[in-house]
């Protein structure tokens, strides 16, 4: 098909989700002409089928759970959660899957939105097939930034195609509550969606192939969240895999498990990881493998066969940290680096420099909106040991020693861990589990990213009585030796 028109930009961004938006905004701030290509909704997966709608589903569930933990408040709960009300609230936060507001934002920063499927067509060139089947060629003077994100990675099991299981999209946009729901996978999506749908009225069975939940976190995170799920009524099964599945009828699915048993549910959600959305973006035209993750340096410049330093990748697609906030950080730095290079200015790529995604290596924050919540940043104790730090760990049971936590919830159950490099006294990582801890995460992130030492932390006085007083209790545990190496 012939090219209908040609357009020139300084920067072309493939993908107008939050990562692409941040890259575009920084490039525009540097005075560059930016074209953004989007084949679905402007705002991307996070805005419509992941972060935002999932938290809209979870918030009412957690709010009710919090109320039930407080004498005097629990008596006010006389009914069940209104799924209809929850779905209506979610729909408002995803603007009924209408992206006109975010499209207006793109034009508001002075960027140009081109709707359609974009593919690389050699160096610095992107060809977009629009909804009218026209082909528009975009040429980038300085850079192309790939921000196409990721898709669900589904296992190759008998019956998958016929069964049409849920992925994160159906789990976050459904307006019907299945009576019985199986969730396959015990990572972040799995435990959050098990929490949400159990709270909305499903009987949820959570299946984990491994020996526990959230295996990349400190071990106590999965233990406490698993206990919370069981207390909420979820059937949690570990060490079990799905061998095959089949749909009995429009409302029933049978899972064949590797222990020989069968599980019959109304719907099944597979939360079994992510794969890069790079299989159909023309990577082969620039010497890269279609469907691969794009390895980048700390400016988000793609390594490998690409010459002249024009191809960047930010967000899920580079496989550094599959988290929206971290991808936005990468997008900002990529956009700033492109702007500096275009102006002929030197780059500050030293650790923690203006053009270095140093936090990807040392200070990635993540939160799980389960019951109890979990939040972590930096290294786990094992990761710190593997990196050959001289590690010392301090642990506390939050509900035993923090008055603010006791006031927050009767019988508060939670745990916090601080990982310290003994040679420098520097904080390497923090993990917290308990009601309300996600709002404490940024203080931990500042401490880790800022190379704050234990000695200096003593001067950061937490307000009494707040859950933040766990910082003081961690310091006391570290000082008094109620910790371990």
Show where each model-derived region lies.
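N-terminal Rossmann-like dinucleotide/flavin-binding domain of flavoprotein oxidoreductases
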Residues: 2-7, 46-137, 141, 217-244, ...
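FAD-site-proximal beta/loop scaffold in flavoenzymes
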Residues: 161-177, 262-353
């Amino acid at each position: 098909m012939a090219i209908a028109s040609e357009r020139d930009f300084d920067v072309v961004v493939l993908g107008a989700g939050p990562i692409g938006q941040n890259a575009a905004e920084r490039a525009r701030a540097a005075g560059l002409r930016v074209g953004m290509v989007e084949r679905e909704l402007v705002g991307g997966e996070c805005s419509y089928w992941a972060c935002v709608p999932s938290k809209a589903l979870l918030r009412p569930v957690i709010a009710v759970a919090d109320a039930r933990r407080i004498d005097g408040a629990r008596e006010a709960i006389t009914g069940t959660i209104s799924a209809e009300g929850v779905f209506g609230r979610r729909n408002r936060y995803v603007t009924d899957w209408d992206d006109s507001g975010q499209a207006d934002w793109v034009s508001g920063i002075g960027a140009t939105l081109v709707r359609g499927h974009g593919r690389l067509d050699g160096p610095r060139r992107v060809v977009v097939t629009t909804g009218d089947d026209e082909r528009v060629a975009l040429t980038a003077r300085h850079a192309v930034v790939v921000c196409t994100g990721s898709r669900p990675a589904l296992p190759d099991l008998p019956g998958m195609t016929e069964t049409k299981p849920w992925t994160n999209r159906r789990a976050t946009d459904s307006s019907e509550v299945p009576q019985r729901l199986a969730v396959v996978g015990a990572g972040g999506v799995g435990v959050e969606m098990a929490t949400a749908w159990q709270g909305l009225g499903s009987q949820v069975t959570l299946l984990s192939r491994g020996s526990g939940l959230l295996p990349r976190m400190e071990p106590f995170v999965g233990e406490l969240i698993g206990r919370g799920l069981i207390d909420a009524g979820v059937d949690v099964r570990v060490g079990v895999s799905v061998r095959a599945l089949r749909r009995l009828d429009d409302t029933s699915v049978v899972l064949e498990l590797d222990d020989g048993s069968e599980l019959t549910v109304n719907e099944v959600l597979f939360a079994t990881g992510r794969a890069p959305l790079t299989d159909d973006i023309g990577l082969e035209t620039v010497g890269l493998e279609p469907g691969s993750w794009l390895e980048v340096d700390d400016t988000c410049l793609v390594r490998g066969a690409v010459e002249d330093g024009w191809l960047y990748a930010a967000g899920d697609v580079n496989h550094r940290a599959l988290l929206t906030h971290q991808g936005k950080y990468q997008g900002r730095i990529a956009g700033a680096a492109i702007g500096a290079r275009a102006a002929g200015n030197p780059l500050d790529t030293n650790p923690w420099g203006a053009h270095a995604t140093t936090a990807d290596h040392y200070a990635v924050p993540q939160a799980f909106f389960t019951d109890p919540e979990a939040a972590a940043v930096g290294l786990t104790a094992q990761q710190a040991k593997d990196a050959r730090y001289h590690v010392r760990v301090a642990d506390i049971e939050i509900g035993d020693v923090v008055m603010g936590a006791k006031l927050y919830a009767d019988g508060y159950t939670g745990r916090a861990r601080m990982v310290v490099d003994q040679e420098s006294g520097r904080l390497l990582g923090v993990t917290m589990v308990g009601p309300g801890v996600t709002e404490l995460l940024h203080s931990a992130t500042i401490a880790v990213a800022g190379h704050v030492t234990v000695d200096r932390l003593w001067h950061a006085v937490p307000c009494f009585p707040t859950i933040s007083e766990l910082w003081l209790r961690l310091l006391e545990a570290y000082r008094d030796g109620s910790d371990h190496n």
